[in-house]
């Protein structure tokens, strides 16, 4: 008798980047919570990833009001302590009840020269601190036009997951973000996004096994908006969205979280 594939609960993550001070952040989270209900949280996991300076304020609000939104961070170092001016340790984030940490976002790779090796170290550090990494992969427009999109993502995945056990990978999140679509208003078509997310799952299956690949959640990111969320989420291998600009507005982000109501 065939075994049903494990259900992958969608994860909608709002990456606020360098936006919202702590007072604005409190208002956004409260407004977002007013727009969502128990049925939404049953259907979808939700995380918000504010700047470091907002984390404590948001954690206090989430705890006090018992809001079932997970707290996330945008970045961390791989060491627990040391002479790393300006950096934040994963263990420090864990003490603030951070659940998810974005690792290897293209802006970190491009603007701050983060390498695949650094990404791998951070993924391991986040896991060791008992948080869930959201590891980002994606290609540039020239790489896509040259037919190298899958090869680029393949390399990032193999390097980023190096040394990890299957059980660790099955519990983490991979976010496929075509770099050319981030903040540009351009979006990969649902078919293109599905093809790349399926390719991500195939690499995980090749590195580990089909069960691990089927359990791993894969997000799509890149100009996700209320108008395209449902079409993207209808794809077999897309298990959520890593949302940038649209997550800054609580009403817009709520509409994305509630994509199933617009299908």
Language model features: what each stretch is:
Residues 1-263:
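Active-site loop-to-helix "anion-binding N-cap" substructures in soluble metabolic enzymes
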């Amino acid at each position: 008798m065939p075994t049903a594939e494990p259900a992958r609960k969608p994860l909608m993550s709002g990456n606020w980047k360098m936006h919202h001070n702590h007072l604005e952040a409190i208002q956004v989270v409260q407004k977002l919570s007013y727009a969502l209900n128990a049925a939404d949280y049953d259907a979808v996991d939700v995380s918000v990833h504010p700047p470091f300076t907002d984390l404590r304020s948001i954690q206090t609000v989430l705890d006090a009001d018992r809001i079932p939104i997970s707290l996330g961070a945008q970045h961390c170092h791989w060491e627990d302590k040391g002479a790393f001016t300006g950096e934040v340790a994963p263990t420090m984030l864990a003490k603030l009840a951070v659940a998810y940490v974005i690792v290897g976002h293209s802006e970190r790779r491009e603007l701050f020269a983060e390498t695949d090796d650094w990404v791998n170290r951070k993924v391991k550090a986040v896991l060791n601190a008992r948080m869930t990494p959201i590891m980002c992969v994606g290609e540039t427009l020239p790489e896509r036009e040259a037919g190298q999109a899958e090869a680029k993502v393949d390399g990032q995945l193999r390097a980023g997951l190096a040394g990890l056990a299957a059980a660790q990978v099955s519990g983490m999140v991979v976010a496929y973000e075509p770099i050319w679509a981030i903040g540009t208003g351009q979006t990969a078509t649902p078919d293109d996004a599905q093809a790349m997310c399926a390719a991500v799952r195939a690499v995980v299956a090749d590195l580990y096994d089909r069960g691990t690949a089927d359990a791993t959640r894969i997000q799509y990111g890149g100009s996700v908006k209320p108008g395209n969320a449902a079409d993207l989420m209808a794809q077999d291998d897309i298990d959520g969205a890593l949302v940038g600009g649209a997550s800054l507005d609580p009403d817009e982000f709520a509409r994305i979280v509630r994509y199933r109501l617009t299908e």
